[in-house]
């Protein structure tokens, strides 16, 4: 390449480098594509508070619900890739949504992964009176009654529904799906004896487990949950490699300067070493993760074929 052209490129890149070095010098907006309340909103706000302290500028949580998350995501994509507008998203938005809904953007192409902040473990629960105390025992019981037993989910096409379909396929089982409007509503009916099996968030289940009303058989992540360390994984109980994971994390628009991306990710890694942040996350039922950008990107790529298979198994339609 001619020396003059190299010099011109260097001059053009100088303003970008200068902006990255001076960042941040004004408030940062964290768009959360959920309504206020709930675990995903809480994880986003915990992250925003920590980043405010670490970066020395306000990080303002901005709830933008609607379109199953697409409205908030589009708002981030319309913003400059300068680190002043970030997305507090989940695996549902960045992985499942593009498989379920026709979008004007591709999350894996149009966003920069920064950090998986916290995991939201899915847990298989059965009513205490049902009998099984392990996943193999559950498999044997359901296999003896194909298609006769029901399981509840927090809604058709949601992660509790899709995750259960993948689990049933791996176990070689058939059950009837009973969708609810939310996980807590499914848990209410489970505690009332109207449903006996549910795959849902750990936070929705701990009180019922502690009261002896349900039994937790397995978590679907690759490792045990810090929230429920006594509950074994599916893989531990005879199905190696099984993993259905959901998490909340931070992303920016494509083209976010690497220096800014890495500074945010570094701040979040420090968050998971902070006892106060860890306690705050565990209190709301979230496992502290605080991953690197590469780990978040790898998780998105790994989950995509799993969720594509789950959607096909579930019969859910693409809108």
PLM region spans:
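N-terminal export leaders
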Residues: 1-12
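N-terminal (or domain-start) structured segment
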Residues: 20-110, 148, 156, 172-199, ...
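Hinge/capping helix and adjacent helix->loop/strand transition within the periplasmic-binding protein
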Residues: 78-84, 99-185, 234, 247-280
């Amino acid at each position: 390449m001619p020396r003059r052209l190299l010099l011109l490129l260097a001059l053009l890149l100088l303003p970008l480098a200068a902006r990255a070095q001076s960042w941040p010098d004004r408030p940062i907006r964290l768009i959360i594509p959920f309504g206020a309340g709930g675990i995903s909103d809480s994880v986003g706000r915990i992250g925003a508070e920590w980043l405010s302290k670490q970066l020395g500028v306000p990080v303002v949580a901005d709830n933008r619900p609607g379109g199953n998350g697409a409205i908030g995501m589009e708002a981030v994509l319309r913003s400059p890739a300068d680190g002043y507008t970030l997305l507090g998203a989940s695996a549902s938005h960045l992985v499942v949504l593009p498989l379920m809904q026709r979008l004007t953007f591709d999350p894996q192409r149009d966003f920069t992964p920064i950090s998986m902040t916290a995991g939201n473990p899915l847990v298989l629960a059965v009513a205490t009176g049902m009998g099984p105390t392990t996943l193999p025992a559950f498999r044997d019981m359901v296999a003896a009654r194909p298609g006769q037993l029901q399981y509840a989910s927090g809604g058709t096409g949601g992660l509790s529904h899709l995750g259960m379909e993948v689990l049933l396929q791996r176990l070689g089982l058939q059950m009837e799906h009973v969708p609810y409007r939310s996980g807590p509503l499914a848990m209410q009916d489970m505690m009332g004896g109207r449903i006996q099996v549910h795959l849902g968030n750990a936070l929705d289940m701990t009180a019922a487990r502690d009261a002896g009303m349900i039994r937790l058989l397995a978590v679907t992540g690759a490792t045990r949950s810090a929230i429920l360390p006594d509950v074994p994984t599916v893989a531990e109980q005879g199905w190696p490699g099984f993993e259905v994971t959901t998490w909340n994390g931070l992303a920016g628009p494509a083209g976010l300067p690497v220096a800014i991306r890495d500074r945010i990710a570094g701040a979040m890694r420090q968050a998971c070493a902070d006892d106060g942040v860890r306690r705050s996350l565990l209190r709301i039922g979230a496992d502290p993760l605080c991953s690197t950008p590469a780990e978040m990107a790898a998780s998105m790529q790994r989950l995509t074929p799993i969720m594509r298979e789950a959607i096909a198994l579930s019969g859910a339609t693409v809108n």
